Amino acid sequence: MKRLNKLVLGISFLFLVISITAGCGMGKEAEIKKSFEKTMSMYPIKNLEDLYDKEGYRDDQFDKNDKGTWIVNSQMAIQNKGEPMKSKGMVLYMNRNTRTTNGYYYVNVIKGEDKGKHQDNEKRYPVKMVDNKIILTKEIKDENIKIEIENFKFFVQYGNFKDLENYKDGDISYNPEVPSYSAKYQLTNDDYNVKQLRKRYDIPTNKAPKLLLKGTGNLKGSSVGYKDIEFTFVEKKEENIYFSDGLIFKPSEDK
């Protein structure tokens, strides 16, 4: 009888530990979603200039008269098996103080031996934004690059995360020492955002991607660190296909 009672107590304790662990994981998942929701709830922003009138999270890193700067970044990276990784994307710095936007379009080819090293082969093409249009600030000869820049759209302009709460049972990671955190969800090819990416990019795989929300800094809010959204289609040795997006709010450099 005593052995039976000990066995019952042992099993009960085990279930209690599992429940507490699961509860903590679910709580952290909710925290991560809430942290990203502050900016993801703004998607889509078809007219990027609307960001001049939107304020992000402010902390003591901001001067009181600084309205802040939005940094917008979207990139598509494709590495077919055994080939160099090719990535193209754009970064914009939207200064709310001056209501001006500058940045660059970039093209990079990373060979296997280059990984982990400083890249000198990245080509940047400086741009500015006027009336929600991206304009080259220097004349270039490459007509294909010109067309790519003219037609470029950031993910924040067409992405939609209204169903974020419906993403369940994510693979959650949290390191309070850094701090860093991430939540990963398996998507389907019927997902709205996946369809939008396939519509705009020639993605050489039929595999449905995983959505990765990853960041560093205080989960409750911080101008220090970063937050990235990534759609990972393929992640293997010498074969990678992913799309990354970022929308972060930082103190202005001209403050």
From Swiss-Prot:
It is a lipid-anchor. Gene3D superfamilies: 2.50.20.40. GO terms for cellular component: plasma membrane. It is found in: Cell membrane. Keywords: Cell membrane, Lipoprotein, Membrane, Palmitate, Signal. A lipid is attached at C24 (S-diacylglycerol cysteine). A lipid is attached at C24 (N-palmitoyl cysteine). Residues 1-23 form the signal peptide. InterPro entries: Csa, Csa_sf. This is Uncharacterized lipoprotein SA0095. Belongs to the staphylococcal tandem lipoprotein family. The lineage of its organism: Bacteria, Bacillati, Bacillota, Bacilli, Bacillales.
